[in-house]
Amino acid sequence: MSDSPERVYPMLLDFVRKETISKNLLRVTLTGEDLIGFPEDQNGSHIKVFFPNQASGILQLPVREGDNVIWPEHKPVPRAYSVRQYRAAVNELDIDFVTHGEETPGGGWALKADIGSQIGLIGPAGPDPLIEPADWHIIAGDLSAVPAISAILEKLPSDAKGYVFIEVDEIEDIHDLVHPEEMAINWLMRNPHDAEPALAKAIKQLPSPEKATSLSAFIAGENQSVINCRKILRNDYQIARDKLYAIPYWKRGKTEEAYHDERHDVMDAVY
């Protein structure tokens, strides 16, 4: 995997419109002069979004001075998201937000966003491609991973084979995805009483791929679920480390700020 080209300065972007994808998934379209030149081939890549300061409601973006980042008086709230799609012809960027409620920095901003609303953005970054070429693929994640999963499926060759597992809390979040015919899409309902996350359980029960000489996988979502899935894929499926990209987006019971350092420890772990 190579790294995506990174635009390191904060861009200021303007709200254009929004679209409901499912009950708890909301697409926001953005534009702005700073967005011109954004790479077209980075759908699914990581971006960092800056939301208005929660106390003042004011959006002020950090600036770089040499190797230093200078934060403003009204420090914005940073959150990690994925590029859903960029359309250079109209200079529009789509970001899909999981809407947990109006009190959250990201989902709350998306729910209330209207003409005049703005955010800051840095990116794209991360591995390219998000899933390595192989005879057979395993893709798994929760609702927070759907934007990246959707982008991956749209980029895969038409003859790609494998399984996709997506865990949701509510049946109303199940929706159609564009995908290669032989990538089997499986929606799973989360059971909070299960000791083992649904994604890990589903991957354990997969039949062995026939005539597959290479495997690759993409796993994203809640911390413990990602860890469990990664262990199974490394230990049971013997997927090579360079063919497996596993990224925890969040951890149940922890804020983004409290989880930040732990996330990087999980990503750096070797299995």
Curated annotation (Swiss-Prot):
Chief location: cytoplasm
Localization: Cytoplasm
PROSITE patterns in the cross-refs: FAD_FR
Cofactor(s) essential for the protein: FAD
Class of this enzyme: oxidoreductase
GO molecular function (one): ferric-chelate reductase (NADH) activity
Higher taxonomy: Bacteria, Pseudomonadati, Pseudomonadota, Gammaproteobacteria, Vibrionales
Family: Belongs to the SIP oxidoreductase family.
Domain FAD-binding FR-type stretches: 8-131
Database matches in Pfam families: FAD_binding_9, SIP
Name of the protein described by the UniProt record: Ferric vulnibactin reductase VuuB
EC number: 1.16.1.7
Gene name, Swiss-Prot/TrEMBL: vuuB
One GO CC term on file: cytoplasm
SUPFAM superfamilies, alphabetized: Riboflavin synthase domain-like (SSF63380)
InterPro entries tied to this protein: FAD-bd_9_SIP, FAD-bd_FR_type, FNR_nucleotide-bd, Riboflavin_synthase-like_b-brl, SIP_C, SIP_fam
Species in which this protein is naturally found: Vibrio vulnificus (strain CMCP6)
